[in-house]
């Protein structure tokens, strides 16, 4: 039985891998709860899901829970993601929500965003360590903290202040 929560094995189009549906279902419930929390507390939640090489799980959760925005590494062909581009997308999402009168939301990101950051952006990160296979030790990088601070700085430059909470 093919087993991976990433759903990244070459199976027929309508066949998901063992474990993917369970992970998507649990993740969906969590994000739906965070959406309720975001609404009642008027906060933005930044959420990171598993998916170092593929954003299938994040996309599945984001679509099922109707997250405000879902970012997956596949959106950047070539795997050269600039940190500021990610921040710009998130800040623009916040601004668009404000135009709708909503100062809250849930931003869901696949951990592959960090894995595919531009080399210059990676070098600027604190605590960047790699394992014996050359993969970034994702747990050692406080990526959501980095995004949160960058978003707060950009929003402050626009005269806005938002409460943001990070979740992993």
Enumerate the predicted regions with their spans.
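Accessory alpha-helical/coil subdomains and C-terminal extensions
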Residues: 12, 16-166
């Amino acid at each position: 039985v093919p087993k991976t929560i990433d759903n990244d094995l070459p199976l027929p189009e309508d066949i998901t891998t063992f474990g993917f549906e369970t992970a998507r279902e649990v993740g969906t419930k969590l994000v739906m709860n965070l959406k309720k929390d975001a609404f009642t507390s008027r906060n933005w939640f930044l959420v990171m899901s598993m998916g170092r090489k593929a954003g299938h799980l994040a996309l599945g959760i984001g679509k099922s829970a109707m997250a405000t925005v879902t970012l997956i590494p596949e959106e950047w062909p070539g795997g050269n993601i600039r940190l500021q581009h990610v921040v710009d997308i998130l800040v623009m999402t916040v601004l668009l929500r404000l135009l709708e009168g909503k100062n809250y939301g849930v931003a869901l990101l696949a951990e592959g965003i960090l894995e595919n950051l531009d080399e210059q952006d990676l070098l600027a990160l604190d605590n960047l360590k790699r394992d014996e296979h050359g993969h970034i030790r994702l747990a050692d990088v406080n990526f959501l903290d980095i995004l949160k601070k960058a978003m707060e700085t950009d929003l402050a430059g626009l005269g806005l202040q938002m409460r943001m909470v990070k979740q992993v």
